[in-house]
């Protein structure tokens, strides 16, 4: 088993061929982190890694002459009230007002496989041989409370997962005010922190900062989602780490609500990383025999740079986070009508768009917002999940049947968590809104948040949308969510339980997803939240793809998809070819570039094909054929490599290489044209050095060995004035091994 407990030294060694994680029981019964990094050989005793010295102002937590001080110890799960003045992973308020806790080792269990987390998404195993898990039980004798720290290490991935569970065994009521899922301490601060930040239409831009003494953090307080502003992910990399070399530690949170990812550097240059539910607005009371389970943190170690980290996340999330029929399954090429029609459509217009989609080879037609209630604009209709017969006199069932008769699958847009005040749902249940009755209810996009912390609300929405699905032939659902939670108050909860509202809301979303995916296992779900405001691992557990951003401009998507690839696999990224001028930026980019960007995702169209010229239609047909030929490689079978960063210059490049290194597809993108430009070579990655390849691009062909293509590279074509290419030029390369 790749987890060993050495009794004499009281040390746990969690390891596989990639990494080692070592923790031990200290003399005061608490847990210390000794090492996390590249795999090292197991042995009985690693106690030399414990560092202890007399320092000024230290609070010693063992009898004299001991020198153990929590302030200067790399703790496994730091708590408040034992002489550590850094931020704790756990804060518990007791009946007497005290927040002092002291959890000491009681027992542990090592077992094969991985347990499910009740009510929460998490990575999983399909056999006990795939992973080994460790539960360490600690106990606070004053509160009579157990703290269970859970670790799982996969056999074939450089991954350790972490979570924590509190179990109240005593009679007093305790209140959890801060419960992190994981904490990790490093002995130095020589790292740079990477995070993915942005806003609506520019999600997950790559940001890097050097660690400094003090606290640096990213977080979400959006309530309904992990947010566009910050993604629930951070990484620590060494300063000289590149895409392909050097150490990096990734931390990804399998959760879709408020989160905190925090890095604190002490005055002695120790680095503490913590990740979990954001304590702001969170409070959870536990009575006797009640427990609280935190979401999971997925930690990746790579000594092969940022690409190595990303590929580990991609493989794990593709293989052991996504589930069901669509796991490791290429996606259908779709056309969505939103940017073609917005709310202004009827059955005839929809059928005309669908007919043209079928002619070019599209496989799935998706009807977006506007099909239900009185939904003629975004002021009304949300919450009323019944068909607007004025637009669709034959209903969704009639429309879906006609679409299927064309030879297309049919998909539908929904926004199940929201309500307009101008709706039957609100008029019947005004108390179902999130918000305090004595406060103004802020609106966003003219809508309000339904209280999914209440089971009766989830039941109502489940029954409403299930009826629509049952009566129709639906193969795909796009589940949108277009606002944050501004006044987090539940009219269905007591004063003591208001701190549970935001977490229970997310649990309600997960409950509805669970019920719908179990009842309709063949439907492909795509999550969406004003674009990418809820692009997180928690969503991928239920919906194996996410609408990456509402910004469909090809040039902007280069940055968005590049950043998203740090954690999320290509097959999870919703990516469409849209009309020009682009509806978000009014920018015009070539049709070829729009496709060359969208290929590296789920691929589809978001425009009215009837408005294209005959030449453009032929180009679209060729694009569809290309994607059908290469989508297994791009979406399922290949490893993704970042080559040139759009955040560092005018050029972007990336590629996907098959696991056997026999096939690859690469994309190169130049943002703005340059006159009399310098020479440039594009160097591929991930190929077999000794394999002869045939490379095709545009009207050119080259035969070269893998080492040539990776180290010498291919010259990027330019002419003196570069009149041919223009702005936003791109090149697609196909690479095939020669026998």
Model-derived features: positions:
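Polysaccharide-binding surfaces and accessory modules of carbohydrate-active proteins
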Residues: 5, 9-13, 17, 31-264, ...
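C-terminal beta-sandwich/jelly-roll accessory domains of carbohydrate-active enzymes
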Residues: 672-739
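Conserved, mostly hydrophobic/aromatic
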Residues: 18, 164, 289, 335, ...
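Short Pro-Gly-centered flexible turn/kink motifs
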Residues: 98-105, 284-303, 728-735
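Active-site neighborhood of glycoside hydrolase catalytic domains
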Residues: 393-395, 427-429, 433-588, 602, ...
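Glycine-rich, aromatic-flanked loop segments that form ligand/cofactor-binding clefts
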Residues: 71-72, 76, 81-117, 245-258, ...
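Aromatic-lined carbohydrate-binding/catalytic grooves of carbohydrate-active enzymes
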Residues: 326-460, 476, 486
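Carbohydrate-binding surface patches
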Residues: 234, 243, 646-689
């Amino acid at each position: 088993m790749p987890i060993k407990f050495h009794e004499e030294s009281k040390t746990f060694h969690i390891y596989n061929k990639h990494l080692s994680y070592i923790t031990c029981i200290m003399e005061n019964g608490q847990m210390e982190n000794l090492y996390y990094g590249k795999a090292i050989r197991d042995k009985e005793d690693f106690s030399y890694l414990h560092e202890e010295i007399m320092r000024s102002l230290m609070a010693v937590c063992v009898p004299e002459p001991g020198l153990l001080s929590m302030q200067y110890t790399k703790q496994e799960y730091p708590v408040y009230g034992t002489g550590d003045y850094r931020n704790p992973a756990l804060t518990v308020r007791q009946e007497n007002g005290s927040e002092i806790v002291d959890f000491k080792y009681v027992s542990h269990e090592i077992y094969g496989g991985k347990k499910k987390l009740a009510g929460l998404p998490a990575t999983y195993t399909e056999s006990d041989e795939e992973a080994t898990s460790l539960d360490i039980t600690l106990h606070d004798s004053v509160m009579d409370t157990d703290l269970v720290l859970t670790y799982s290490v996969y056999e074939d991935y450089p991954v350790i997962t972490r979570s924590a569970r509190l179990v109240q065994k005593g009679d007093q009521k305790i209140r959890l005010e801060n419960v992190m899922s994981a904490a990790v301490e490093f002995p130095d601060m020589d790292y740079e922190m990477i995070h993915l930040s942005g806003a609506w239409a520019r999600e997950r831009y790559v940001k890097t900062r050097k660690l400094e003494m003090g606290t640096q953090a990213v977080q979400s307080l959006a309530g309904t989602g992990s947010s566009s502003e910050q993604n629930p992910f951070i990484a620590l990399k060494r300063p000289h780490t590149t895409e392909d070399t050097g150490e990096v530690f990734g931390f990804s949170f399998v959760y879709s609500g408020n989160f905190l990812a925090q890095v604190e550097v002490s005055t002695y240059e120790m680095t503490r990383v913590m990740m979990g539910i954001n304590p702001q607005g969170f409070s959870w009371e536990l009575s006797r025999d009640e427990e609280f389970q935190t979401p999971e943190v997925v930690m990746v170690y790579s000594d092969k740079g940022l690409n190595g980290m990303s590929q580990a996340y991609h493989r794990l999330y593709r293989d052991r986070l996504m589930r069901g029929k669509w796991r490791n399954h290429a996606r259908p090429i779709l056309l969505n009508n939103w940017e073609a029609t917005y709310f202004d459509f009827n059955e005839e217009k929809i059928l005309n768009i669908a007919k043209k989609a079928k002619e070019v080879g599209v496989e799935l037609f998706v009807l977006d917002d506007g099909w239900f209630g009185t939904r003629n604009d975004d002021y009304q209709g949300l919450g009323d999940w019944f068909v607007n017969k004025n637009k669709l006199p034959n209903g969704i069932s009639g429309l879906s049947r006609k679409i299927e008769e064309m030879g297309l699958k049919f998909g539908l847009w929904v926004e199940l968590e929201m309500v307009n005040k101008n709706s039957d749902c609100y008029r019947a249940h005004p108390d179902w809104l999130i918000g305090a009755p004595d406060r103004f209810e802020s609106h966003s996009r003219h809508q309000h948040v339904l209280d999914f912390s209440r089971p009766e609300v989830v039941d109502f929405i489940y029954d409403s949308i299930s009826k629509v699905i049952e009566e129709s032939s639906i193969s795909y659902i796009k589940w949108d969510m277009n606002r944050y939670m501004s006044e987090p108050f539940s009219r269905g909860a007591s004063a003591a339980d208001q701190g549970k509202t935001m977490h229970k809301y997310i649990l309600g979303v997960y409950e509805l997803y669970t019920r719908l995916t179990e009842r309709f296992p063949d439907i492909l779900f795509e999550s969406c939240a004003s674009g990418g405001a809820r692009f997180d691992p928690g969503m991928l557990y239920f919906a194996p793809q996410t609408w990456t951003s509402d910004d469909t401009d090809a040039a902007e998507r280069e940055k968005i998809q590049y950043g998203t690839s740090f954690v999320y696999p290509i097959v999870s990224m919703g990516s469409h070819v849209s009309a020009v001028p682009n509806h978000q930026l009014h920018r015009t980019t070539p049709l070829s570039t729009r496709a060359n960007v969208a290929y590296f995702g789920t691929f589809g169209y978001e425009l009215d094909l009837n408005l294209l010229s005959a030449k453009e239609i032929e180009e679209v047909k060729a694009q569809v054929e290309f994607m059908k030929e290469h989508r297994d490689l791009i979406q399922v079978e290949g490893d993704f490599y970042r080559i040139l960063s759009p955040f560092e210059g005018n050029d972007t490049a990336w590629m996907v290489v098959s696991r056997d290194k026999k096939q690859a597809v690469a994309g190169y993108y130049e943002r703005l044209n340059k006159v009399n430009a310098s020479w440039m070579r594009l160097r591929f990655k991930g190929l077999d050095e000794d394999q002869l390849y045939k490379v095709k691009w545009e009207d050119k062909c080259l035969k070269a060995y893998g080492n040539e293509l990776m180290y010498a590279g291919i010259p990027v074509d330019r002419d003196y004035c570069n009149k041919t290419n223009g702005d936003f030029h791109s090149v697609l390369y196909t690479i095939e091994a020669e026998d």
